[in-house]
Every structure is written in structure tokens, then in C-alpha cells.
């Protein structure tokens, strides 16, 4: 723990302290006095420190040069396996973070180490992979020693020994195989090791198809490493054998899904091809920045012949350029570029032409629109080919004549996107195209490519602004920086990149918004921005279409004249048979027009009548329901854009817009309900005659099901606050319809509509009370289902409506006092709701209605509301105290009682419910038996009578009945009503409870009833005790096993406290031994006998009285 705390402190102070702490730890590791256990602990701490160097691996450079040789030397002399493992783990972490190439060269090299290392591998009992990895890595470096291996030990063939040791690791799947491949490649590259290579290749070729995939990867990795480090003249001696082996491996690729094999095969073929082509085999035809003319000059054809194997190698790499795995394509592209760099120009040109031909296969040009169709091209080919071109550009291997063919393809690649069903490809191609642009401008001078760059820069800028992928936008930004930084000829380039950076392109909304406006400020870039936005209106992604429409609206406000030119072509596109196009161009056109109207730009609104001519579009049978929905959605969004402005439209145009809304309602699509509502909310402001409302009301009346009318309810719920003549009619219709709805999903929109309409209706009519009474009936919804308390979907808007009414009534005074107190009582009831948001809303409502004249007359309620206002943090104890105080207000007492008892029930549950019950219990304790002896308006007898009245009610809904019963049971158990009991009233109450028990199917409700009976066993009244015994016995025949078991347990409790002494011994014995989990019929006789005996006792008690 102390190490972890100090580590955290070091990270927060200075990174340099990490290296100093690591240095101390490594010194302790190298100390001979350190035990194996302490070294292992130090290793764990060192690894933790090393993890923090992963993002800055160069921090380790000073440590590596000092400690790698020391740790390696210490590894040879240490005998303890634990210490050995700790050292190799630290060395492996160095390799992992800094790279094995940087660590390997630091191992001590000498002829004496070779024998020690292979002996250590042979004789050591250490089987950990990191030990073998480090020793093999060191051995691969030690083999650089320029001495014949046979001179090390006359008794052994050292080469064979090392070869045998290394070859056995090729079957492993771990990282130690990689180190063994490095050993083999170093061994083969020695002057005295070529014979081993030939034997290795022959052996691999003969047994290739029998070997595991790990062995094959090891063989190819060994060969590729050998071809990389071995001198060319030595490699030429093995070309035939290596080529034959690679052909065998290539044949094995058929049906092979392992991408690592294909990548290694690309590497091997590439390095073999480089061996076959000397550096000076071709004239110097590459571009040189010191000779700009070299970009345009073509060298004379060369008659120089190349090796016959090269054709096979190039053919394989060309096929690998379109491999299914990206890193295989990348390896093939790099390999081809390296080979081309050594080919004569006439041969290099053939390879480049072959790649261009692969790209243009299945690509078609539309001469009318001057666009390219790439829908059936291969994205794999395009990605590999562009990576190949990028490597050529970075090396200066592209001539002017080829640029004329390649750059148009790169321009297409910058916006390449093809959709296959639900899958979209093209992200990697656009990213590779940005890499090409970066490489091209990084290598070539301004004077060389100045005439080629115009379209390329515009396409790049479009990618920066409008690409969907953040990594592509950032890659395009990097390329743009390279273009402008190296080629200052671009107009306003520096001003442009002052707005564009890696952070600003992170948010795509910012790209379409702020950045788009800033780029469009430069006239030379404005046209390309417009064109790409209009192209994006055809995009399949709705989000892209909407962002483009938003951007066009912003631009239409600032550049109305330039954008007005594009309107006629857009209107033509509305007649095409593509739903995506129609949707995009509809919202785009509406956004532009909305921008024009917002700045009063002169525009004839009737020119876009076709925008609302949905009937002609939707009548076409080729549109599916989903496509029709999308077209309607586009028109709805267009209505929102156009009618959101203060414009004058003729009646025909308005009627056409309203017919779109009716058509959208008829579709009955849930996904566009909000858009229908929003469109009508802006359209209704132009309905001076208010005819549309009458149409909607008729639509509701004609609907055969509530599902069909649900959309209209939602429309009415979102109506704006404007003058309507139909408010009273709407209100009446909704209140009449509500009782007929049997699903909360349809009731909730009606309640929300009433929330908005009833307060407006208050201002327009004098007879508002009938609506308020019906609203109070609507709002008492406590329905629950699998989604939880869905009744809150009704109570919340109803409470908002009631609070708005009371605020208006504070000055209007249209409501009677009884109705007002009912409304206040409803809000009071919600202050005890179990949903936190509803309770908070109820407290807010109380604060809003405090201005009502009736509340101002009630000093107690006013004080409560003021204390709530002074308690903005809603402190639990204060609120509970205030809630209990509501019981003292006569007009609110019943609702407060319901709220408290239902919320707290038996005093268990949430912390808030427990606290509230404690306050309620203390309130009951302080009540006297008679209110005349108490500070309260009410006494315990009054409270007891209230409980009895509710428990005696057969109409009370179960949601309230059982929590109130639990509350009553808890108060009885706490002895609140011990000194007096209304026997007659209690007897009636528990009789009604018993009747409920006979019809109750809820185990929770029956359990609450049995708890009440158990509590009554402690009553001082003997008659009540026997009634409770009888009713408990009745539940012994309940069909629910759990209830029967609890009833039997309750009777056993009665027996334990001496209430069943009158039972015969036989029945007492049966009560103890009967199985209550068997079918009911088996115990029916016993239960009947038990009930009869208890009834006789009851009759006797009544007779005695």
C-alpha cells in the first residue's frame, strides 16, 4: 500500500522521478544480498512503474543502456530460479515498451556468451516463456560475433546444436517462437550457416502440409528475417530453393484463412524480389526536388532484363493488394513500391497501369451529370491500390503522365462510400486517400504539381468538413496542413487553417455548422461547400441529410443570391423515384426557403407548390410503406421550416400542407408522431378559420380504436398557446373519451393534452367546474404493470394542470371553495407519492398556488408552504414534520392520512419512508384518547375510527387498502390503541377484511391480513381474539401453499401465547403434525372441526355478554 501511494505521488509530481525510482529498484535487484522473495516484490513494483512509460517509451533510453547489460550478465551467474524469473520479466517489459530491436543491441556480445546461452537453454530447468524469450533474443544478438562457430567447442557441432535448440520453438504459439526465428535468421546469415538454411528450406518444403499453423508462421518469419539481414551475394545462392519453398507455401494458402501467413508470404516475396534487383539495376528516373523537370521527363525504354522469378513475385503482390485483411494489403502495397523503386521505368509503368486497371474495373462515368458510379467496385482493391500509390508518392516514384490518371482516382477515393445492405464500406479508402495527399505534397515541390492541385484540394477540404468518421476528418486535416504548409500558393490557405484543427473537426455538428460558415466565407471555397452539401442531401443516412439541411439554412441566410441558383435543379429532383433523394431534397429545399423567408429575401412561395404534392408521389406503387413514411417525414420537416416564419400564404397552399398532416396521421407510424405534432403546431397559427381543429375532432370521433386516435391526442397535447374557439369542445371531447380508453399508452397522451388545454379553457369559459371535476377523476390513476407505476404518467400532467388552474383561479375566482379544496387535496396527496420526481413536483405546485385566496386564509397551510420554500434542499426531517402537520388541517386531513399511511405502510422500505413512519408514530403517541385533552384537533379515537371506516369499506382499491391495513397493524403492534378499542367497529372491520381475503389472490395481501390477525391475538378483548382465530383458520384452506403455511404458523403462535387452551388434545396434536403443503382437500376435515370449536367459543362469549 505504501508503494502504491508513493507511486501515485511520483506520477503527480514529475515523470523524471519515475526513472530515478526505477534506477533504485534495479540497483536493489542486482544486489547479491537481496533474497528471492524481495527481488520478486521489487520486480512487481518495477513493472508498475514501467507501465507509466508506455506513452513515453524514450524515458527508458538512459536506463536501458546502463541496466540491460548488467541485468543480462547477472542472469548468467544467478542460480536461483525465482531471481532468474524476476530479471527476465523486467527485461521482457523493456522489450515490450521500448521494442525488442532497441533492447537487443544492448545485450553484451562476445564469443564466450554463445556457449553459455545455448547451454543455459539446454540445461536450465526454468520453463517460463519469458526466460526462453530473453535468452533466445540475447543469443540472436550474440551470433553476430565474427568468429567461426566450430572454434567454440571441438567436441560439439555448435551450429547444429543451436539449430536444434531454436527449431523446437517453432511449434510454440507464444512470443518465444519469435525470438527463436531471430536466432535462426542470424544463424543462417553467417558465412558458415548457409548450408543450414538450404537444409531447413528443404525440410520445411517436404513436411509443409503436415505442420501446424504455428510452425508455418515460424518458418516464414525466419526466412523473411534472413532475407532482410543477409548480404545480397549470399542470398543469391539460395534464391532457387527459397523461391521453390515459397511457391509451396503459396499453394497452401488456398482455403487458408490465416492472415499472418499471407502477410509473411508478402514479406518473403518482396524481400526475395529486392534481392533479385540490385539497387543500380534501373536508371535514375525518380523525382528529385533539386531537379523539378524530372517530374515531367520520361526516360528511354530500357532493354535490361529482369529475373524470371520477378514476374511471379509481382503477380502475387498484385493479387495480395486486394486481400481481405488490411495489414496484408498494406504489406503488399509496401512490397510493390519497393520493387518498383528498383525496376526500369518501362516495367514500373506496367505495374502502375495494372493497378490503375484494377481500380477502374466496374467503375462507370455518367457523362450527363459528370459523376462516377463506384457502386460495384471492390473496396478492397481500392484500399490496397491507394496505399500503393501513397508509398510511390512518398518515394517520388510517380511521373506527371501517371498523375493525370491517379489524381482523379484519389479525388473519388476522398469521398468513396459504398453501401451493401446495412453495411457501409469506404472509411479505410478515404483515410488512405488522405495519406496519399499527405505523401504527395510532402515529396513533390510546389512548381512541379501546381497545375494539378485545384480539384484535389477542394475534394480534400470537403472531406475535412463533411466526412462521417472522425479519424478520416483528422487525417484529412493533417493532409491539409501539409498542403498549405509546403505550398503557400493556395489562396487564403493560412487563414483557412487558422479555423481548422484537430479539435474543431472532432464534432461533426461543428463541422456542418461553425466551420462550414467560416470556410464558405472564402469565395474560392464556397462553391465546393455548396456542391458537397447538395450531394449529401442524397445520402442514405438521415443524420447526414439533416445536418446538410441545417447547414444550407445557415448559408441561405448569409448567401441567399448564390444559393437561389440551385433551387430549380432541386425542384427537378423531387420527381425522381428514390425515397432517400426525395426526403433529402425536400428538407434541403425547405431549409433554404426557410432561410430566405427569415431574412425577407424576395421569393415566390408558390414556386414550391410541388414540395407539398405528396399525393402524386405516394400513389406510386413502387414505394413501400417505409419509403412513404420517409417521404412524408421530409415534407413534415419542410412544413416546420417554412411555416415557422411570418409569411403570407394562399388558402390552397395552406390546405395542401394540412393534407400532408392528415396523410401522415393515416400512416399510423409511431416514428413520425413528434414530427406530425411539431408540423401542426407551426401550421395551426395560420388557421384563422380554425377549420383544421374541427377536422381533427371529427377524425377522433370517426376512429374505431383508440390506437388510431393516439396521434391526434399527441397533436392536441402540443398545441401552442393561441386563441381557439374550440378549446371547450376539445376539453369536453377528451374528458368523454378518457374513460373509454383501457390502456395507459392511450390515456397518457389525453392527460398531456388536457394539461395544456384546460388552463386555456379556464380563460374562455365560465362553466369550468364540470371539467375540473372530471379532471380530478382522471388524475387518480395508480395503475402498475411490468413497467412500474405507469399511473404516474397521468398523475404528473394532471397535477401540472391543476396547479395552473389554481394559479389562474387566484384572480379569476371561477371555482367553488369545495372544488378548490379538492384540487389542493390532490396536490397534498402527491407530496406522499413514492416517486421522487412527483413529490418534488407536488412541492413546487404548493409553492405556485400559495397565492390563492383560500390558502392565504388558511394560516396552517400557509406556514407549511413557507417552510417548504425555506427548505430548498428538501431536508427529509423537515418535510416529514410538515407532512404530519397536514393532518391537522380539516379540509386536507383525509388526503394527508391516505398519503402518509400508503407511503409508510408498516414502517419498512426506503430511508424516507422509515423516517416518515417514525414521525407519524410519534404524532400518534402524543394524541390523547380524547381530543379535548390533547393539543391536536383530533384524538386517538378519531384516528382509530378513520382506520375502521377505511378497513370496513368494500369499495376501497387494493393499492390503498393493504398499505393502510399494514399501517393499522403496525400501530396496534406498537400499542397505540391498547387502552381502548371500538369492539363493534373492529369486528365489522375484520369481517370485511375476511371477505377480502376470500377473493384476494395476492400472497402479499393475504400475508398482510394474517399479520393483522396475529396482532389482534394480543388484544385485550377476548371476542376480537376469537374472531381473529376463526378467520385465520379459514385461510388454512387457501389454494396458495405459502399462505396456508403462514396461517398454520399464525395459529401456532396463538397456541404459544395460550389462546388455544380450549382445543381438545387430538386437535392440538394434529395442528402440530399436519403437512400444509399437501392438497387442500386432505386437511379439510380438520379445518372444519377447528372452525366449529372456535365458533362455539365465540357464541359462548356473545351469550355471556
UniProtKB/Swiss-Prot annotation:
Glycans are attached at residues 122, 126, 373, 721, 883, 1083. GO terms for cellular component: cell division site; cytosol; microtubule; microtubule cytoskeleton; mitotic spindle; nucleus; tubulin folding cofactor complex. Gene3D superfamilies: Leucine-rich Repeat Variant. Pfam families: ARM_TBCD, TFCD_C. GO terms for biological process: cytoplasmic microtubule organization; microtubule cytoskeleton organization; post-chaperonin tubulin folding pathway; protein folding; tubulin complex assembly. Keywords: Chaperone, Cytoplasm, Cytoskeleton, Glycoprotein, Microtubule, Repeat. It is found in: Cytoplasm, Cytoskeleton. HEAT repeats lie at residues 308-345, 347-385, 401-446, 452-489. GO terms for molecular function: beta-tubulin binding; GTPase activator activity; protein folding chaperone. Interacts with alp21. PANTHER family: BETA-TUBULIN COFACTOR D (PTHR12658), TUBULIN-SPECIFIC CHAPERONE D (PTHR12658:SF0). Has a function in the folding of beta-tubulin. Microtubule-associated protein that is essential to direct polarized cell growth and to position the nucleus and septum to the center of the cell during mitosis. This is Tubulin-folding cofactor D. It comes from Schizosaccharomyces pombe (strain 972 / ATCC 24843).
